[in-house]
């Protein structure tokens, strides 16, 4: 292949793309740098085996070459193309378990414990960052409660840092607020998994950020506050007290030290909680206990440090992102204007459940309140599926198209309830591949469509065909079955809504009672009471039953319609899989994928029947109609069978793990007997005509 360079040179990102090209298929490749194109996008002109790619920057060239390589490897003849990135910044939210002594929000779980050593393995980061680039993600946000001690030596607080990388043989106490996650008994049972000085740690993360730059990925650091893990026993008087002058100095100088140590760090994200003065609901606009003290801490520490550092280093680019959690938009802007320091705003778009409505309404008030020129980031919480391989491009496309893209800087997607490091769930993981490799289809769907929203269904069919080495006809069937099965739990969550991940874990139909510190399986009576998604187009079970009792239509999509839709998705997926014969395949990944789709079908069937039963029990309570109760009992008996079938599949393919946001080891087979209680609940229920 003849390579012609016009206005550019072979940089590491371009080399990464070139190395993916096959040996044959191109006679002449011209790379032409043109500033007029959209940042990160490209134009391609194809004349037979002569290809010209025009792009304004390295990322545009890299993505163009990756797309070209994929087409050529798939036997597709390249055609003219133009891509303008749909969303400029497409990110991953990664809660990072650096050390038992400096936990992240997610460290009270199996995946964090197993991944601590991996976070200090450069080979892991090469794999992970390569995968991000291949899937068109260009922002990596690393989230931790107490970043400074494991990353830098602060000149003003030189002893407030930790050497080596350690885990503890004593588990982390589960908490939903990040408080008390490193204790004396953990300290008494520390084990060193990697010997490193703090200077070597700093150099390690410089290398990670350098490699990220070579894949056109910006790295951000996000914190919660106020947490001073890793400074225990310090001689300076650093504590978690946000009013302490010493603590404020520690945060101020720590932020400056981060900026100085990591020239490639793109910015820092700030949360006004979870360990600050205001500990009420995140619905701050409705809470009389809310006050400005927490935002003031952010201003006087992070904000002032960034402002002062940039004044001294005017060529440095650095973003400050303030989350809307436990803070009011106008208060944030007003407080930071006093420095003054320009900031970005971040909003949690679907609360903890992105797999719900394609048009979440939680952001509606903020969009009305914000200044017209305010641009913001979206946090997109991916906390519904830790085991099952999700795959529904139709849902992702609609979700992305409904985002307020014109006002956005970008988004970052990821969980609080799992570490997206190496996979320790799968019983057949072998060498423990990247979690994002097991979830490759989900990872690809969101990255690709947020970059190129115009990717058609046929593109994903070819992707599946190439991944599994199956004919396109079979790939099309698998695409449809996967899409239909994945839709079941999304629709369930729209009817059975709880804001937070610990309140609703769909793969286990359970929640954590934070006060009692117990795992509770959601029985049918809870489904009867549970609201539907806030501000959405879905009616709850109770609303639907009331409408049916009074023979009037619901203003929103009824829970009966939703349950019927869930069951149709499950039945269609099952019917397609019944025609799809992969019994003789030697492709283990394909077999495991089909098993996951079957598990989705059974879980969806369970939820569809349980919702229908809950509606009928609401009607029975209101009217005493025994027919409604009889139908509910029949549905719940079938639902219990579906659950057992689901749990059997899960237990055969996945190891139970301690999930940090639930604070316990979740084994779905433990709930088999509880599903039978739903039948007894229905049989023992008494009518309450006062409801009518």
Language-model features: locations:
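Feature activates predominantly on carbohydrate-active enzymes
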Residues: 1-13, 35-41, 45-247, 263-264, ...
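A eukaryotic intrinsically disordered, low-complexity regulatory tract that is acidic and Ser/Pro-rich
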Residues: 661-692
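Solvent-exposed, polar/charged alpha-helical surfaces in well-ordered, non-transmembrane soluble domains
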Residues: 63-66, 130, 210, 249, ...
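Aromatic-lined, polymer-binding surfaces characteristic
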Residues: 224-248, 266, 273-279, 284, ...
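Short acidic low-complexity segments
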Residues: 18-33
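C-terminal non-catalytic alpha-helical accessory regions
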Residues: 415-420, 429-672
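Catalytic-core regions of glycoside hydrolase
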Residues: 95, 115, 138, 152-160, ...
